[in-house]
Amino acid sequence: MQKLRSTSTHLILFKKSAQLLLALLWIFYLFFPKSLIAGNLSSLSHLIGNQDAILVGDPTGRVIFSKNAQKKLIPASILKIFTSLVALHFLGEGHRFTTDFYMDRDSNLKVKGYGDPLLLSEVLDEISEILITKFESIRDIVLDDTYFQHPIVIPGITSSFEPYDAPNGALCVNFNTVYFKQNNNIYVSAEPQTPLLPFVLPRIRQSALDRGRIILSNEKKETTRYTGRLLQYFLEKKKVKSKGKIKIGRVLKEKDTLIFKYVSRYSLKHIVAELMEYSNNFIANQILIASGAKLDPPGGTLKKGVRAGHFFAKKILKIDNFSFVEGSGISRKNKISADSMHKILKKFKAYHYLMRHTDREFYKTGSLKGIHTRAGYIRGRKGGLYPFVVMINTPGKTTDSIMARLLAALG
């Protein structure tokens, strides 16, 4: 009997020891790899100066390494990740921008824009194919861009000819840019789908460039008028007689007749993918302003867009300490911490596949003079996504050496 009790006791002790060993092995499995990764990442610390920050999370969202994570820094274009989330929240990933076409009693064609960021030459060409089934001739083309405030002044935007300074508006085409080159000393279009209209030649000559992509000006509503000129070109190419002028005006819904509503072929999710790929400042602020108009209708202003951003940051992401003045990241007045960017990345994880990517990294970069940033996700050896934020606000430094070590540590 005594021997039986002894055997039973040994079995109980063995089971408890086995359970303890399994628990220790489980803890080791859960935490040792992360501790090892954190140890590897600690070598990055000396690369992060007082005006820089880094944060790395694990696939569950837990922070495994950080330095200066609470410091508010200039994010540059990684801010577009946040702007995309704002638009996805207020507009919905399936949202499609619209443009309305009316006829008034005097046979004037009226066009009302609602901020479509991907209204392109080929789209206007397709629209004209539909419009020619509605009429054979028109008088004036009247352009209604009143859905957005005019002008919209974006902090950080200058009056240069560079595409990143393109102005925003409710009725714009080709990102408010013109792409040209010279052929036998004559200016011609540099893209087959877009004619080079005489309307833009003074602006091209003013740029003093032989070739390139320049922006149109907001002065005298040049950007809006260009949309009308391009539409007129495509209509006349299809033998529609245009007897009048290109004018700025308003649609009178109680008097004018809606003859066609163009619904964009591109969903907002597609637009966000384009934004992540090309980092277009114009697109970023178009979707921000449209988000503001959704939150506080009718009509879009930058102020409403910024308000929508702050609302989303505070109520949805629980971010309070955030300086947000526009959606593209071009303004140095935008400031955010790596910790707040981590919250943004956790929310954007469901859309990570919309970002630029290599074999292991999904990412968005940002750069201004003296500023280099990078944020996204690195796929670990077990397939999980590790969110990361690197913000370098020290002039003369880049993210290159940091990213090389980060990829190696998580490889």
Residue ranges, per PLM feature:
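Extracytoplasmic
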Residues: 49-51, 78-79, 96, 106, ...
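Conserved serine DD-peptidase/penicillin-binding transpeptidase domain
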Residues: 41-42, 89-319
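Intrinsic disorder/low-complexity segments enriched in small, polar and charged residues
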Residues: 15-23
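N-terminal secretory signal peptides that target proteins for export/translocation
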Residues: 1-15
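Bacterial N-terminal signal peptides
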Residues: 22-31
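Beta-lactamase-like hydrolase cores
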Residues: 36-72, 91-94, 130-137, 409
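C-terminal soluble interaction/assembly domains
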Residues: 323-411
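Active/ligand-binding-proximal structured segments within catalytic/core domains
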Residues: 73-87
